[in-house]
Amino acid sequence: MSAIIDSFIAPPCHDEIEILWQDEHLVLINKPSGLLSLSGKNPQNRDSVHYRLVQTFPGCTLVHRLDFGTSGLMVIARNKAINAALCHQFSQRAVRKVYSALLCGHVEHDEGVIDAPIAKDPALFPLMSICAITGKPARSRYQVMDRFYDAALPLTRVRLTPETGRTHQLRIHCQQLGYPILGCDLYGGLALPGTEQIPRLMLHASELNFVHPVSAEAINARHAAPF
């Protein structure tokens, strides 16, 4: 099998990372859209959340990632012990994440569940695919918050709650539902007339709930979507 070659070069991101809260153990940030979570192998993809934060917080590590185009809440561990404890919470699905998104079209039902297994396919890289045979279980909940009745580009604002954490899960699940996320270049969010000039992926990590590994305090972080 031939090696997968990632030719993506991230354009410069001039937006700053917003530090929302910190203590000696962890940092909560608001990641801007258009910034990698981790630096890529290509030297031109050096700029990232981790690259920037390690300058201020030496030894910090990423517990989880957000896609390049996704903005919003991330928790950063400031040492290996905190990283291990938070990773355990993620692996046990003890961390609750909620996203805000704008979807193309008017979603028919006010709420629902998308249960569709997701598979990697080297032939489709970087796209993922829905596949009942080789896919891993993937489940997302959605709730309609508002519908916008613009005749040229009808949209729906939704809350998305992933119950699993597959690559591109929310993006491909919304496409599977029939309403791609506005601005999504991989899964149909730039295909409709009027979407060509959308400046970003309209997906934002707006809620992050976990237990502080040291104090055992429930952390319920919130950050409103900028769209």
Across the structure, where does each feature detected by a protein language model lie?
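The conserved catalytic core of RNA pseudouridine synthases
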Residues: G59-L86, K120-L177, L203-F227
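Conserved hydrophobic positions within beta-strands
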Residues: I19, L103, R141-V144, I181
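Central beta-strand plus flanking loop segment that forms part of the substrate or channel wall
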Residues: R96-H109
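Pseudouridine synthases involved in rRNA/tRNA modification
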Residues: M1-L26, P32-L36, K136, D150-A152, ...
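Internal amphipathic helical hairpin motif
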Residues: N45-T56, A123
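A short alpha->loop->secondary-structure connector
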Residues: N45-D47, F90-K97
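Short, solvent-exposed loop/turn segments at secondary-structure boundaries
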Residues: S39-N42
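Residue-level signal for well-ordered alpha-helical positions
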Residues: H88-Q89, P117, H173, C184
